Amino acid sequence: IDDTEFITYQIEAQTPKKVRYSIFNRINTGGLSLNEQEIRQALNQEGLGVKFLENICSDPNFKKIVGISSKRMIDRELALRFIAFKLNNKEFNFNNMSDFLDESMENLDQIKNENKLIELKKELIETLIFSEDILGEKHRFSRSLAIKTKTKTLNRSLFDVITVCFSRIENKNLFLTKKELFLKNFIEIIQDERSEFSK
């Protein structure tokens, strides 16, 4: 034991969050490795964002429509993805989605206006309900919408596109009257193996 070498990492309070994420990812080996959202939860557990995402994901409509387990925080990531795009609706200036969500998690902690948070949750839940009106029950944001042989595995890219775009529709009643035309074109996009949704 006297000759055993230990490697320790000391993270100061002023250490930038990006460095903390980097260190956490480097030492996140062995056993059951944490996924990216679990790391965000761990590094921001004292922040408002963690509680807010939990509040969204415990909503009965969210649980019913998204239909994904909260065991590995994937539901929290989905809620965060929607919020990230709503808070950053300008040009995407990030190298990857992970960095985008890391920063968005921090930005979420900075929102002090409770009405803003209430509105974000309301917008997501209403959008999820609208997605059921358009796509049908139990669509689960999966490619099985267009390819019946596919299992109903949630596709994150589909979730992003559907929720963010549907949330921006101003006249939803008019859109509902045109939903068959939308579905025809949307299914063609999903069936295209070159599209982002094929991944």
Residues covered by each model-derived region:
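C-terminal subdomains that position terminal phosphate/3'-OH groups for nucleotidyl transfer/ligation
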Residues: 79, 85-199
